[in-house]
Amino acid sequence: YTNADLIYACHVLEHFPTKPFPFQPLTWKEVLTSWHKALRPGGVLRLSVPDIKAACEHYLLTDDFDSVQAFFYGGQKYDFDYHYHGWSYETLEKELMSMGFCDVRVYDWKSTEHFYVDDYSQAYLPHMDKTNGKLMSLNVEATKK
């Protein structure tokens, strides 16, 4: 149970509440704790979550709320497709450090072994403009002490 080298979770953490609900009993802190337990010492947790600061900046710059709405509230295309929490680098780093992670850092999705997988770690605005757009995902790695 404690031997994983890497856990990768792309746009998962924001779907867990701060406090448990009957229909969503796990909190994001419990999820992070579970992932921490599953990693071996020196193992890496690689997260991608909506970058709340980037979404706010894009909205303030463009006044186009429709383009950033899903980053705040989730896509809402099906049950449970909504967000309970938003993250900045500073808030995520603080939580990861308090849970026993170290060396918290932003990673470049282009440098990962899964760069060819078109997932939300590559979410840009304007939509999928990876050359001129702004990355809307906060991509963070942390190492288990």
Per-region residue spans from a language model:
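A short acidic, Gly/Pro-enriched loop at the edge of an enzyme's catalytic core
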Residues: 1-8
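S-adenosyl-L-methionine-dependent methyltransferase catalytic module, highlighting the catalytic core
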Residues: 17-143
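Short catalytic micro-motifs in class I SAM-dependent methyltransferases
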Residues: 8-15, 20
